[in-house]
Curated annotation (Swiss-Prot):
Family to which the UniProt record says this protein belongs: Belongs to the RuBisCO large chain family. Type I subfamily.
Highest taxon in the source lineage: Eukaryota
Ligand binding (Mg(2+)): 192, 194-195
Official protein name in the record: Ribulose bisphosphate carboxylase large chain
Source organism per UniProt: Ginkgo biloba
Length: 444
């Protein structure tokens, strides 16, 4: 006779283990689970643990050939979400050995690969992941990190300034380079390729790289500052992406750029390794993130994508703006900004941080505030993001009635004024606009 009965069995018998003590090497996940009516929360939580680790819908005889106790994911805690009917946070612990070392791709394939289409769940959202040092240490992480970047650029004690070149599609390479030069000459540290600028018929990548490099060197000579332009190396194949990164390095420019979600984590990690080996900084754009993180009840929170990027590698990443949005959102955004920059981040549910995260010595990533911001937001941005950030004004630079260079000057003057006022102990939240008004009187 066989040692088990055929048929569908309850997951919670095997995968719901409230007495489990989590190990330091476990990867922990917090899922927001919305079960279908009639499905008990323990069963839903256990189903998530099972389907994202060793489980399948029935018992198979090959289960006897492995040690489930050693390899199974475990749902070790379930708590109702306050104010929501029939919604729970399920905490799942995964043994370290379920994941390939140094592969964000494999981490996501396992944890979020299959389980989101599961019938017993109405919706499922991955809110946070605790990455143990035992796993994070298998990644290179950011090519350089915040401190090394400051040393390379020789810029200290203030946020960095950027600008996306607009109109994002349609300019010729020559005119594009001209806009880059004007912005950098006016006082910005960086200009940026838009995320959808790759290599289109109106502007091929090689021409753009060339004219942008010319703009960078000209602006550097005239200002005596180090300048950069995020040359977007994203391409249709990994080989083509690497070809573009190599060409950028041959031109001697300081930084390239990648769209890490559309390009994929495998491509991103390869590029990050190349960037460290060759002294290039890497700017990361999060195109496609809202497809994954916009829904409150389903998908993945951006803080998970941010942690994944820190492991995969990038020196800058776009992180929203916080300005003009709701207060609660500010706390949550600052939560994942800290996850990007700091070595050790305490668990704090009010900021959406479900687990204490210890990055040990992995370099940090500079958060980039970009999108719909302009010079009058400068006091708030300086205060919220602090010095370790990149503030990007696209239309807020190029939309200046006098032109690109005066737009760049305005941003730089405002930034320097805000930083100085803050260092003198003035309250930017209250006096910010006044600070900028005073500065503009003396600005050329």
């Amino acid at each position: 006779s066989v040692g088990f009965k055929a048929g569908v069995k309850d997951y919670r018998l095997t995968y719901y283990t409230p007495e489990y003590q989590t190990k330091d090497t476990d990867i922990l996940a917090a899922f927001r689970v919305t079960p279908q009516p009639g499905v008990p929360p323990e069963e839903a939580g256990a189903a998530v643990a099972a389907e994202s680790s060793t489980g399948t819908w029935t018992t198979v005889w090959t289960d006897g050939l492995t040690s489930l106790d050693r390899y199974k994911g475990r749902c070790y805690d379930i708590e109702p979400v306050p104010g929501e009917e029939n919604q729970f946070i399920a905490y799942v612990a995964y043994p370290l050995d379920l994941f390939e070392e140094g592969s964000v791709t494999n981490l996501f394939t396992s944890i979020v690969g299959n389980v989101f289409g599961f019938k017993a769940l109405r919706a499922l959202r991955l809110e946070d992941l605790r990455i143990p040092p035992a796993y994070s240490k298998t990644f290179q992480g950011p090519p350089h990190g915040i401190q090394v970047e400051r040393d390379k650029l020789n810029k200290y004690g203030r946020p960095l300034l950027g600008c996306t070149i607009k109109p994002k599609l349609g300019l010729s390479a020559k005119n594009y380079g001209r806009a880059v030069y004007e912005c950098l000459r006016g006082g910005l540290d960086f200009t940026k390729d838009d995320e959808n600028v790759n290599s289109q018929p109106f502007m091929r990548w090689r021409d753009r790289f060339l004219f942008c490099a010319e703009a960078i060197y000209k602006a550097q000579t005239e200002t005596g500052e180090i300048k950069g332009h995020y040359l977007n190396a994203t391409a249709g194949t990994c080989e083509e992406m690497m070809k573009r990164a190599v060409f950028a390095r041959e031109l001697g420019v300081p930084i390239v750029m990648h769209d890490y979600l559309t390009g994929g984590f495998t491509a991103n990690t390869s590029l990050a390794h190349y960037c460290r080996d060759n002294g290039l900084l890497l700017h990361i754009h999060r195109a496609m993130h809202a497809v994954i993180d916009r829904q409150r009840n389903h998908g993945m929170h951006f803080r998970v994508l941010a942690k994944a990027l820190r492991m995969s590698g990038g020196d800058h990443i776009h992180a929203g703006t916080v300005v003009g949005k709701l207060e609660g959102e500010r706390e949550v955004t600052l939560g994942f900004v800290d996850l990007l920059r700091d070595d050790f981040i305490e668990k704090d549910r009010s900021r959406g941080i479900y687990f204490t995260q210890d990055w040990v010595s992995m370099p940090g990533v500079l958060p980039v505030a970009s999108g719909d911001i302009h010079v009058w937001h400068m006091p708030a941005l300086t205060e919220i993001f602090g010095d370790d950030s990149v503030l990007q004004f696209g239309g807020g630079t190029l939309g200046h009635p006098w032109g690109n260079a005066p737009g760049a000057v305005a941003n730089r003057v405002a930034l320097e004024a805000c930083v100085q006022a803050r260092n003198e102990g003035r309250d930017l939240a209250r006096e910010g606009n006044e600070v900028i008004r005073e500065a503009s009187k003396w600005s050329p």
